[in-house]
Amino acid sequence: MALYWQVSGQGQDLVLVHGWGMNGAVWQQTAEALSAHFRVHVVDLPGYGHSAEQHAASLEEIAQALLENAPRNAIWVGWSLGGLVATHMTLHHPDYVSKLVTVASSPKFAAQGNWRGIQPDVLTAFTDQLVADFQLTIERFMALQAMGSPSARQDVKVLKQAVLSRPMPNPQSLLAGLTMLAEVDLRDELQHISVPMLRLYGRLDGLVPAKVARDLNHLAPYSEAFMFDQSSHAPFMTEAEAFCQQLIEFTTR
């Protein structure tokens, strides 16, 4: 059974990949704005939204599911966990990716030593909570994503509406996603990316600290980076117009 895709607009192919616990509906506003410039492809990842019947336990399993209907030579935009997916596609299925954009993402989400990120005990707590009450856990995660942003309440409302507008995620895939956030480390592989890369961050993000952006300036010196001052983990919602502008400028350079 194929993944659920929505395609709109005309022009160069651009793929939008959502994050953990969410689905493609989070991109609705972004897709509408970008479809004036691109042919926009929005996917529900395995286990999420209209692809909730599917399951993938690793980045490569997600990639294999995406390859069935993904356009070749496209711009890939990945938010949060979706950034790991888009980076994996760039590294392992390069025919499909012409440019890479990561949004509020990190090659390694879990904190370790000097590397900033989500504390492992927070991820463990999420895993435990997920088993007990996955709907409540997703709501907590939404609040965590929006925390710090001046429009936090509105952001959470939009995220919640997006998630609830489609079938609830598959708990097995939610657990697999948390394992990826806890264990995946692509830092050493970034040097092998040969396509143009843009990294977008929210200055107020509590999940991907601003320091990660600075560290990645050294790990991926060929890439470009931009920090949204008023955003936390969802700059495409908080600063929607500026977000689309950054994408358009990067892809037309």
Regions from the PLM with identified roles:
Residues I193, R199-Y201:
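Short beta-strand/loop motif that positions the catalytic acidic residue
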Residues L204-V208:
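Acidic catalytic loop of the alpha/beta-hydrolase fold
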Residues V131-V184, D188-E189:
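Conserved alpha/beta-hydrolase catalytic His-Asp/Glu region
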Residues Y4-E53:
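Conserved HGGG/HGGXW glycine-rich cap/lid loop of the alpha/beta-hydrolase fold
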Residues S231-C244:
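Catalytic histidine-centered segment of alpha/beta-hydrolase-like enzymes
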Residues G78-G82, A86:
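Gly/Ala-rich beta-loop-alpha elbow adjacent to hydrolase catalytic centers
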Residues Q28-E32, H41-V77, Q245:
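Active-site loop/oxyanion-hole signature of alpha/beta-hydrolase fold enzymes
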Residues L91, Y96-A132:
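Flexible "cap/lid" loop of the alpha/beta hydrolase fold
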